[in-house]
Amino acid sequence: MAKRLDLKGVNIYYGSFQAVLDVSLAVLPRSVTAFIGASGCGKTTVLRTLNRMHEVVPGARVEGTVLLDDEDIYAPGIDPVGVRRAIGMVFQRPNPFPAMSIRDNVVAGLKLQGVRNRKVLDDTAEYFLRGTNLWDEVKDRLDKPGGGLSGGQQQRLCIARAIAVQPDVLLMDEPCSSLDPISTMAIEELIGELKQEYTIVIVTHNMQQAARVSDQTAFFNLEAVGRPGRLVEIDDTEKIFSNPTEKATEDYISGRFG
């Protein structure tokens, strides 16, 4: 079930360095929210904070509140593994388990949860391969290694793996940056289909992609080297690209910087 994300006064640190300053925003269910901005502005840091992935970096910490519906994912006693199960992530470069079969890649998360029934696993693999428009391309080689697929197919396989554990939210960190235009189009079409069931947040450097796939867009900016990134504005994507409120947003969209 798609859920809402709310950030309230979020500050992100790595040791003594403040990477992100005072971010508050809402990510609506069954929609696509795009994070845009120049390199180093904090958009990927904020994305990784949404499912506590930033915690793999020593010294990382968050101040403020991140709510999944009404649950604070940083509250004492909340298991980060459970958070990452509810809020899945697809990374910049496709990262299937290379020696694992296509079928086993999809159901890897279920196996970690203790599911062993072969029919359940097979049916699940087929269901989510169909859901990512990959089934017809791989149905005759399900036992072949996932690493043998093309880049675009590997990324769709990773998306199938991410949604097979039925998360509430799906995070995508530049999912098309290493793909060719045809594969990119396939991923973008898939995002449009997936938002009917999931809440999606995507980081992209491609402003045309943000305009094509997202319902709302958040623009992040870095005032100066060594200063924290911050959220400049968030609004409906059409408004951000046609009539932004902030001059910094207009300057970035128009190519004056970034």
Swiss-Prot record:
Its EC number is 7.3.2.1. Pfam families: ABC_tran. Keywords: ATP-binding, Cell membrane, Membrane, Nucleotide-binding, Phosphate transport, Translocase, Transport. It catalyses: phosphate(out) + ATP + H2O = ADP + 2 phosphate(in) + H(+). It is a peripheral membrane protein. One of its GO terms (molecular function) is ATP hydrolysis activity. Residues 5-247 form the ABC transporter domain. It is an enzyme of class 7 (translocase). CDD domains: ABC_PstB_phosphate_transporter. InterPro entries: AAA+_ATPase, ABC_transporter-like_ATP-bd, ABC_transporter-like_CS, P-loop_NTPase, PstB-like. Coiled coil: none annotated. It is found in: Cell membrane. SUPFAM superfamilies: P-loop containing nucleoside triphosphate hydrolases. One of its GO terms (cellular component) is plasma membrane. It comes from the Bacteria. One of its GO terms (biological process) is phosphate ion transmembrane transport. Disulfide bonds: none annotated. PROSITE patterns: ABC_TRANSPORTER_1, ABC_TRANSPORTER_2, PSTB. ATP binds at residues 37-44. The complex is composed of two ATP-binding proteins (PstB), two transmembrane proteins (PstC and PstA) and a solute-binding protein (PstS). Part of the ABC transporter complex PstSACB involved in phosphate import. Responsible for energy coupling to the transport system. Belongs to the ABC transporter superfamily. Phosphate importer (TC 3.A.1.7) family. This is Phosphate import ATP-binding protein PstB. It comes from Mycobacterium leprae (strain TN). The gene is pstB.
